[in-house]
């Protein structure tokens, strides 16, 4: 409304119609074209997630929303989270298995070296024992009578060997001869062990006797005192 008088050529009805037009222009009705434009501009003007400050912690609703975005449709959220945890544990175990394998390999190498050392030490000890026994092979042969004077009776195994040779059964004769050789070697080893034990016991007895002689006094107390008095009398 105009204050005071109206301009020439205008009535109050004209002024009211102009004011209504101005109101319509200020607040126009939304059309379809305007709605589409508003939708485009609104989508572009929506604040993105990165526009928010990063220092603030996310709320539960935002975390749930992110989880639901990652979770496929038709699967509950708790099952999806459990699946993710299991997947993470599986990947960690796969990454940690090569270390355990390397440790096992190192342990197996150490065990092999230890077994080799033990076998080598056992072999060396067996060799030393065998060398000690071989020294006594045939040690008592000189006490046996000569072969001409000795009556030799064949054993059952020797008779079977002779029978196999007469029958031209070479394989059987070889097998029986091997058995005879092992038997003779066993007899030699048994005699060598007995001789070794005898020598060892004899040495121990000699050593103990020598130790007793060392411990025994050269003279008694009275003889020593008498000798001391005689030596003192010479200086008087």
UniProtKB/Swiss-Prot annotation:
Source taxon at top rank: Eukaryota
Region (Disordered): 1-158
Regions of compositional bias (Basic residues) in chain numbering: 100-112
The keyword Coiled coil is annotated on this UniProt entry: yes
Residue ranges with Basic and acidic residues bias: 22-40, 141-158
Coiled coil residues, start to end: 101-167
Biased composition (Polar residues): 122-132
Keyword annotations: Coiled coil
Record bears the keyword Coiled coil: yes
Protein name, entry field: Protein FAM204A
């Amino acid at each position: 409304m105009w204050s005071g008088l109206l301009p020439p050529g205008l009535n109050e009805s004209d002024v009211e119609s102009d004011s209504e037009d101005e109101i319509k222009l200020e607040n126009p009705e939304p059309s379809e074209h305007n709605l589409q434009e508003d939708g485009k501009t609104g989508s572009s003007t929506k604040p993105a997630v990165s526009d928010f400050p990063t220092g603030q912690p996310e709320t539960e609703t935002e975390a749930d929303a992110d989880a639901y975005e990652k979770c496929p449709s038709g699967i509950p959220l708790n099952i999806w989270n459990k699946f993710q945890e299991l997947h993470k544990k599986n990947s960690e175990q796969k990454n940690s298995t090569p270390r355990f394998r390397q440790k096992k390999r190192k342990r197996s190498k150490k065990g092999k070296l230890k077994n080799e050392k033990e076998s080598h030490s056992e072999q060396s000890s067996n060799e030393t024992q065998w060398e000690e026994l071989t020294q006594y092979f045939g040690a008592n042969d000189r006490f046996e009578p000569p072969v001409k004077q000795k009556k030799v009776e064949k054993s059952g195994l020797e008779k079977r060997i002779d029978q196999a040779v007469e029958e031209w059964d070479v394989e059987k004769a070889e097998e029986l001869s091997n058995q005879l050789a092992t038997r003779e070697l066993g007899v030699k080893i048994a005699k060598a062990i007995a001789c070794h034990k005898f020598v060892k016991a004899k040495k121990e007895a000699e050593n103990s006797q020598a130790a007793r002689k060392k411990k025994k006094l050269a003279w008694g107390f009275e003889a020593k005192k008498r000798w001391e008095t005689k030596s003192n009398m010479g200086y008087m």
